Amino acid sequence: MTIRKSGDILTELKRLNRLPEIPHTLSLFEAAWKNPTKHIQELANIVEADTAISQRIMDTANSILFRGDGKVLTISNAVTRLGIIETRNIVHAISLHSTFTSPLIDARKFWRHSITAAFAAKKIAEYMNNRFKWQVDPAMAFLAGLLHEAGSVLMARFFLRDFEIVREQSSTFDAFIDNESKLLHMNHAVLGAALFKSWDLPHEVIMAVAGHHHPARIHADHYPIAYVTCLAEGACWLIGEGNGFVEANINQTSQHLLEQLEKHRLTRDHLAFLAKQAQADSESSNMLGMF
């Protein structure tokens, strides 16, 4: 197997023009989102032009989690009901689903893991903000949870044999993290963060993705959201939500996760409780039915 450093991998992908470009609808939506004078109708118009996304927006707006007095029948009403933050989350989820695929990864398990992590990150952010007076934006935490594993799919997509060897030698996800560093001299967190930087996604999301395995290595300003994302990923493993290339074992708790919990005197049981709440929210939102 060829040993590659993270910088070499990114350089090679760029040279071969293989780094995925930001999906068109997501690009339009993010550009409109950054406009301080953005209007909900402008965002609704962007969504409506994409059949796949607009259908999912409608489905989610009429789901158990969001359904109000009656069924919404138009995209404008659906976006109004969901709000622009929830709409943005769905645009990201659907756009990225078509971008991040690999024959080495079970797509259904991968996206179930990612969406559950997104809802878990939101829950954990709210909890940490309340307990420790942190100021993690729950919406940014949701996106970080959704995107945290994207680098793994890039590795599996563009370096199939290398990824397969790492996976074969890893019975747990902790082992996978160790092996990708030892054998590839890089990790999926760095690769995913680099891609999202090229897409000009929010800086705090990029930092959260980059540091979701080692939050303490991230600048102090972004430690809280990186830590939240770290726990969100760990929460998924606690409730059996594997990531599509390493199976979850609810009877085995990651030593790395236990160490992270200890940093702020959190307990495994409470994290599992938040994870179950997040899992219930993800199921009632209808987002899991997207994939």
Language model features with spans:
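Terminal helices and disordered tails flanking the catalytic cores of nucleotide-processing hydrolases
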Residues: 1-11, 254-291
